Swiss-Prot record:
Name this protein carries in UniProt: Intraflagellar transport protein 70A2
GO BP annotations listed: intraciliary transport
Coiled coil among keywords: yes
Assembly description: Interacts wit the IFT B complex component IFT52.
Length: 664
């Protein structure tokens, strides 16, 4: 029946055909037929009513509202059309318009439904006192017999939502749980319960409720293709159907992704997004689009920025979008763009940025032009947060003394949240001096924060880095690098390659060569095991360790050994040559060439020959490897032919020939 026009339908069959299409959820085709029919009979009540229904089911709420508005004008005595119009406007997030239409309804039989709608509008607008007042009216029975009572499932859900928005997550959980017990399994209520658990940092029960939603969704609706995309199966979009909405699968997978991301299980987070029922990109909801942008930012930053910028133009957009876009601009050092977005969207600043986040972003933007002023701003923010941390530490101690477990849990959660705000402020302060290569001052900043941060992995890692960079504190650096590596020793490739490399160098510089060799054997063994499962996978850990060690020897003037180590580290080239590894290798070669041109070193012909052969291999294997990763929002892109390892290796080879006077 695809593409069927009204002229092809036999006389007397039109209504039956339309109802069959609606029965089969083929709303788009029904819309085509009804729209054509209404051009001939624009005042057909039945046609407009069915068209409005189809638009509503297709989630084209503004179009549905327009149809219901026409119907209410044609039939003012039928107030249900005005109610439907208000509901469609609410669904379209046109809250002032929905409120205006709802106020026109004075039929007592619609009173409780209007109250529910008005409460939902106020809740969506963020007017929680107004929403609570209307919900309490409903619960008290003032709205008539069908308004429910205190133990009515709808009432419990409404109260749960209000408690959630007010930050009372434990109480919200109780309401949602009671609603499920009263009504039986409801996907949307189960999702609400999972969300409240997540917000209360109870990740295990949240994941349990999510797993239940997913399991039931798969069992009851196998046609939704859950997990197909992750498995690499090419499937068509399932669309934004009512069935998909009713299963709460999209919401569940998004929440699962958020939890895994919070737990730093980034692969699992990405998998949760690809596991959800397949839809075309233009069909994605704002939350999924936002999460895709965030979780693929490292691999596809340009795409991520485009998605977040697009979302900011939509109404509504996830409330985190504004802050996340600004933070990412600062992370990628697009401070001018961050300043422009803040200036152009002052109305969003007060709505979506906390005072802490605004002050932090303001300091970060100031860093670009006035680092001293930025440091003072960050210091003020750090002082405020350290006061809060001390107060919360005292609260925890007092609560433990009084054996008040509930207060302990609440204070510990608040402490953790405050610490997560403090760490970025501290790191931003440290980065100002790091950029000036004033490592002693960076160390001093970190030492001031030891009271709160000594157990925090990010703090420990950065302390290790600053000790390492001072070149006379390798032993102290080992004390910070070692616990990080040992914590992940059974999965050593999950540790950053530069951490492993710096630890190896620190061992070598403190004459602990056996420890360095043992660590390198461990890395090599894990890389070999990984290669058995996926022979074509590029793994750079051991390569980068060897490159950093080679760089160390080059820096000490031992180019014979250093360059040889660098060259051997990149074998086999098809598995070890990449943008990052080339970066380390070319630095050593540039240093070598600089010293050769100054005649401060002399290399044996055999070493020079080895260098030339190495660069020729890089020329062969580096054709499709970018020499540098370009910034995602650069307007002027590098020439694609020049931004390759092949091009740069030819340049280096030409420089070698020029310096040593060989004929090419």
């Amino acid at each position: 029946m695809a593409g069927l026009s009204s002229s092809q339908i036999p006389d007397g069959e039109f209504t039956a055909v339309v109802y069959r299409l609606i029965r089969d959820s083929r709303y788009s085709e029904a819309v085509q037929l009804l729209s054509a029919e209404l051009q001939r009979s624009p005042r057909s009540r039945a046609g407009l009513s069915l068209l409005a229904y189809c638009y509503y089911r297709l989630q084209e709420f503004e179009l549905a509202a327009e149809c219901y508005e026409q119907l209410s004008q044609m039939h003012p005595e039928l107030e249900q059309y005005r109610l439907y119009q208000a509901q469609a406007l609410y669904k379209a997030c046109l809250y002032p318009e929905a409120t205006r239409v709802a106020f026109l309804l004075d039929n007592p039989s619609f009173y409780s439904r209007v109250l529910r709608l008005q409460a939902a509008i106020k809740y969506s607008e963020g007017d929680l006192p107004g929403a609570r007042s209307l919900v309490e009216q409903l619960l008290s029975g003032e709205a008539g017999e069908d308004s429910g009572g205190e133990n009515d499932p709808d009432g419990l859900v409404n109260m749960g939502c209000l408690l959630y928005k007010e930050g009372h997550y434990e109480a919200a959980c109780s309401k949602f749980f009671a609603a499920l017990q009263a009504s039986g399994y409801q996907p949307d209520v189960s999702y609400n319960l999972a969300l409240a658990c997540y917000s209360n940092r109870h990740y295990a029960p949240a994941l349990k409720h999510i797993a239940n939603i997913i399991e039931r969704g798969i069992r009851q609706h196998p046609e939704l293709g859950v997990g197909m995309t992750t498995e690499g199966i090419d499937v068509r979009s399932v669309g934004n159907t009512v069935v998909l909405h009713q299963t709460a699968l999209v919401e569940a997978f998004n929440l699962k992704a958020a939890i895994e991301y919070q737990l730093r299980n980034f692969e699992a987070a990405q998998e949760a997004l690809t596991d959800m029922p397949p839809r075309a990109e233009e069909e994605l909801d704002p939350v999924t689009l936002h999460n895709q942008a965030l979780m693929n930012m490292d691999a596809k930053p340009t795409e991520g920025f485009e998605k977040l910028q697009f979302l900011l133009q939509q109404n509504p957009f996830p409330p985190e979008t504004f802050g996340n876009l600004l933070l990412l601009y600062c992370k990628y050092e697009y401070f001018d763009l961050a300043a422009d977005v803040l200036a152009e969207n002052a109305h969003l600043t007060y709505k979506f940025l906390t005072p802490y986040l605004y002050d932090f972003l303001d300091a970060m933007i100031t860093c670009q032009t006035a680092p001293e002023e930025a440091f003072i701003k960050l210091d003020g923010l750090a002082g405020m947060l350290t006061e809060q941390l001390r107060r919360l530490t005292k609260q925890v101690q007092e609560a433990r003394h009084n054996r008040d477990d509930e207060v302990v849990i609440k204070a510990v959660n608040e402490y953790d949240e405050t610490l997560e705000k403090y760490i970025p402020v501290l790191m931003a302060q440290a980065k100002i001096y790091w950029n000036l290569e004033n490592y002693q001052m960076v160390e001093k900043i970190f030492r001031k924060s030891v009271e709160f941060c000594n157990d925090h992995d990010v703090w420990k890692l950065n302390v290790a880095h600053v000790l390492f960079m001072q070149e006379n504190k390798y032993k102290e650096a080992i004390g910070f690098y070692e616990p990080i590596v040992k914590k992940n020793y059974d999965n050593i490739l999950s540790v950053s390659a530069i951490v492993l490399a710096n630890l190896c160098v620190s061992y070598i510089m403190t004459s602990q060569n056996e420890e360095a060799e043992e660590l390198m054997r461990k890395i090599e063994k894990e890389e070999e095991q990984l290669s058995y499962g996926d022979p074509d996978k590029k793994i750079y850990h051991l390569c980068i360790v060897n490159l950093v060690i080679g760089t160390l020897y080059c820096a000490k003037g031992n180019y014979d050994f250093g360059i040889s180590r660098v060259i051997k580290s990149l074998e086999p080239y098809h598995k070890k040559l990449g943008t990052d590894t080339w970066y380390y290798a070319k630095r050593c070669f540039l240093s070598l060439l600089e010293n050769m041109s100054k005649h401060t070193i002399m290399l044996r012909d055999s070493v020079i020959q080895e260098c030339v052969q190495f660069l020729e291999h890089c020329e062969i294997f580096g054709r499709s490897i970018p020499a540098v990763i370009e910034q995602p929002l650069e307007e002027e892109r590098m020439h694609t032919g020049k931004n390759t390892v092949t091009y740069e290796s030819r340049q280096l080879k030409a420089l070698i020939y020029e310096i040593i006077g060989w004929n090419m």
